[in-house]
Each structure stands twice: as structure tokens, then as C-alpha cells.
């Protein structure tokens, strides 16, 4: 641990992921998202290892879900986004994929969320925008978060950058994150490495730090 102006500055992975100062954010591991990725099962298996390690270490866990609004409330941005992602040329052709309580909206059942773990819903890419996540972490005295899930280039990178801007130390579990587009995912990882906001580790390295 480094020290500056009476502050403790984590210098190693183990220092950054201390169970009393960090949380685990499991990003959008939903049925309807996992089935869009050819390697979704592999990502889920590695995320489950991260979740189990966090539970064993007593780390606080927050699961994020992406939620669609009904078409009448979707607004300009969400409607345009649906048209792009669904390759439609008219707003009349799109369908909200992740309406609350729809089959695709649900988290993967293997995650088996526990009573002392939170589920937060969002309509944005950053897990911090429009959710109580930052308030909850700060109120628990946490200054870092570990993140894994899907998709690296769509929501995880924005969450890492937003979290860093809010003063948290992001820790990205590289092999427990999946990309919708492999080239874009690799580019997002390269960008995060270049910026240096996040510590980047593997599932095995994280599990060792939590032992």
C-alpha cells in the first residue's frame, strides 16, 4: 500500500480487492444476452467462478440487468438504438428485447442470487447512470469494484470509465468478460489498458487475491 497526504493508495491487486473495501459488479448476465453470444456458456462458467470466490471471501455483490422500456416510453435514443441493433429501418419494426419480467430479461438462473445480494436495473450502458450503485458503494465505505460480465465493448468499458471518474478503482476480470464483437471487445480492452484507470486481472489471479 502506498501513502500520500494521509491516504492509502492500493498498489497491488490484493490491496485493491480487499473484501472490506470493494464490491463485485456482475454486468448484464441475462438469458437474452447470453444466448446472443456463441461463447456465452464459457463466459458464464468463468463468471460463476468469480461469484463463488467473492461469496467465499465475503465480498458484497451487485448484479446489473439491462431493461427495455415499452416502445411508447423508449424515447429517441432507445428507439434509434433498437433500430441499429435490430437492423430495422423503421421504428414500427423494432421490439423491446428486455422488458421487465420477459424471459430474456432474467438473470442466468445458475447465478442463484442470494438474499444479501442486490439486483439493480438500468436503461443505460454505465451501471452508475440512473442507478443507486455509487451511493450504495460509498455508503458501505467501498472505494473499488471488481467487474465481470457482458459485454466488454458495450457496457463494461463505460462502467469502468464512469466508475473511475467517480473516484472508484475499477478492477476488470478480463477472462470473465464477454464481447458481442470480438474485435470491438479487444479494442475496448486495449483502450482501458492504455488509459490505466482499471487494474486488469484474470479469474485465477482474482481468486488468489481473495484467498
Where are these regions (language model features)?
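Active-site loop/turn elements of alpha/beta-hydrolase fold enzymes
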Residues: 29, 66, 175
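Von Willebrand factor
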Residues: 54-73
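…and closely analogous acidic/polar surface helices at protein-protein or active-site interfaces
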Residues: 37-54
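Short acidic, Gly/Ser-rich segments with clustered Asp/Glu that frequently serve as metal-coordination loops
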Residues: 30-35
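Active-site-adjacent betaalpha module
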Residues: 1-23, 49-57, 78, 82-211
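Short Asp/Glu-rich motifs
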Residues: 36, 66, 73-74, 156, ...
Amino acid at each position: 500500500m502506498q501513502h500520500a497526504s494521509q491516504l492509502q493508495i492500493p498498489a497491488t491487486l490484493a490491496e485493491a480487492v480487499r473484501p472490506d473495501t470493494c464490491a463485485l459488479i456482475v454486468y448484464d448476465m441475462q438469458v437474452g444476452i447470453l444466448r446472443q453470444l456463441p461463447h456465452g456458456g464459457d463466459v458464464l462458467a468463468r463468471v460463476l467462478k468469480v461469484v463463488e470466490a467473492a461469496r467465499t471471501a465475503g465480498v458484497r455483490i451487485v448484479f446489473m440487468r439491462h431493461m427495455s422500456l415499452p416502445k411508447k416510453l423508449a424515447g429517441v435514443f432507445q428507439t434509434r438504438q433498437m433500430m441499429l441493433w435490430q437492423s430495422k429501418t423503421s421504428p414500427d419494426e423494432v421490439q423491446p428485447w428486455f422488458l421487465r419480467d420477459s424471459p430474456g430479461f432474467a438473470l442466468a438462473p445458475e447465478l442463484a442470487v442470494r438474499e444479501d445480494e442486490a439486483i439493480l436495473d438500468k436503461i443505460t450502458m454505465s451501471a452508475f447512470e440512473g442507478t443507486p450503485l455509487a451511493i450504495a458503494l460509498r455508503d458501505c465505505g467501498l472505494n473499488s469494484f471488481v467487474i465481470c460480465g457482458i459485454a466488454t465493448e458495450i457496457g463494461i468499458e463505460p462502467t469502468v470509465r464512469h466508475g473511475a471518474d467517480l473516484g472508484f478503482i475499477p478492477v476488470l476480470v478480463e477472462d470473465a468478460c464477454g464481447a458481442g464483437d470480438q474485435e470491438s471487445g479487444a479494442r475496448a480492452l486495449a483502450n482501458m489498458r492504455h488509459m490505466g484507470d482499471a487494474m486488469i486481472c484474470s479469474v485465477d489471479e482474482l481468486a488468489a487475491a481473495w484467498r
